[in-house]
């Protein structure tokens, strides 16, 4: 018995889910100024006689519909008293999907929208969408059924940027504040001191520098070598006279 109840609950839940998912009318979020398509659709194997789009959380809501699409008369805009432009277009050839187009969305468009879809020629094959019972043999098999779905349009306001204030200075010298003299950076003109051209910003190595470097190495290197050898010899005891040692 428990298994039967669970199975029945699963079947009822699946049927309810099928009811709620039959009409697709999904939420949309867009920035102000963007082009927005509010698409309401049902499966293409359904037969649609009328699709009505309106403002509000529930159908009607005391407001006129925005747009109506019918399978035989095409589409037309009623605008429902709103002062903004709309376009309604069939999306597919089977006339089971329409898009309400808002070319320049503003904060006035934000809110809930409803989509009422009227199905026609309901049959046993799609009987789960129709009001009928298996024991009835009447026109209720073919009765029209209206399904409703709602969505919410969220409009993100445009970011406002504060205007830049430009301050223009007059050329009059009577009110010009006194400015302290600013020391200027030395120019990049090289200074010549004798045979050595000196540029403090871009020093360049000349032949004079190389010649002085070679002379310095030639003079200083032997002197340093002699000093180093002498120090090593002194540390090693060279030249010291040892006891018992008589030089020849």
Curated annotation (Swiss-Prot):
Name the UniProt record assigns to this protein: Glycoprotein BILF2
Q: Which domain of life is it from?
A: Viruses
Q: What intrachain disulfides are recorded?
A: 40-115
Tell me the protein family, please.
Belongs to the Epstein-Barr virus BILF2 protein family.
User: What InterPro entries does the record tag this protein with?
Assistant: Ig-like_dom, Ig-like_dom_sf, Ig-like_fold, Ig_sub, Ig_V-set
What segments bear the compositional bias annotation Basic residues? 175-188
* Main localisation: membrane
Per UniProt, residues of the Ig-like domain are 19-125
Q: Does the keyword Nucleotidyltransferase apply?
A: no
In which compartments does the protein localize?
Membrane
**Source organism of this protein record:** Epstein-Barr virus (strain B95-8) (HHV-4)
Q: Which UniProt keywords apply?
A: Disulfide bond, Glycoprotein, Immunoglobulin domain, Late protein, Membrane, Signal, Transmembrane, Transmembrane helix
The regions listed as transmembrane in this protein's record are 210-230
Q: Which residues form the signal peptide?
A: 1-17
Residue ranges for the region (Disordered) are 167-191
* One GO cellular component term noted in the UniProt record for this chain: membrane
According to the record, glycans are attached at 27, 37, 45, 73, 83, 92, 95, 104, 116, 121, 131, 144
| Protein's membrane topology | Single-pass membrane protein
């Amino acid at each position: 018995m428990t298994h039967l109840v669970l199975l029945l609950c699963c079947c009822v839940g699946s049927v309810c889910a099928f009811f709620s998912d039959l009409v697709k009318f999904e939420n949309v979020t867009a920035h102000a100024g963007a082009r927005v398509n509010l698409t309401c659709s049902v499966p293409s194997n359904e037969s649609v006689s009328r699709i009505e789009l309106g403002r509000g959380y529930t159908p009607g809501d005391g407001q006129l519909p925005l747009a109506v699409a019918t399978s035989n008369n095409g589409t037309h805009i009623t605008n429902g008293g709103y002062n903004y432009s709309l376009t309604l277009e069939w999306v597919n050839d089977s006339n089971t999907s329409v898009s309400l187009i808002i070319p320049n969305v503003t904060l006035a468009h934000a809110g809930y929208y409803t989509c009422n879809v009227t199905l026609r020629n309901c049959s046993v094959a799609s009987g789960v969408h129709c009001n009928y019972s298996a024991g009835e043999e009447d026109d209720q098999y073919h009765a029209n059924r209206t399904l409703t779905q709602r969505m919410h349009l969220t409009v993100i306001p445009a970011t406002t940027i504060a205007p830049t204030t430009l301050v223009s200075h007059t050329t009059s010298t009577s009110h010009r504040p006194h400015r302290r003299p600013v020391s200027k950076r030395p120019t990049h003109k090289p200074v010549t001191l004798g045979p050595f051209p000196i540029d403090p910003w871009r020093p360049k190595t000349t032949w004079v520098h190389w010649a002085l470097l070679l002379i310095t190495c030639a003079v200083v290197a032997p002197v340093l070598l002699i000093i180093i050898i002498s120090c090593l010899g002194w540390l090693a005891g060279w030249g010291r006279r040892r006891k018992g040692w008589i030089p020849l």
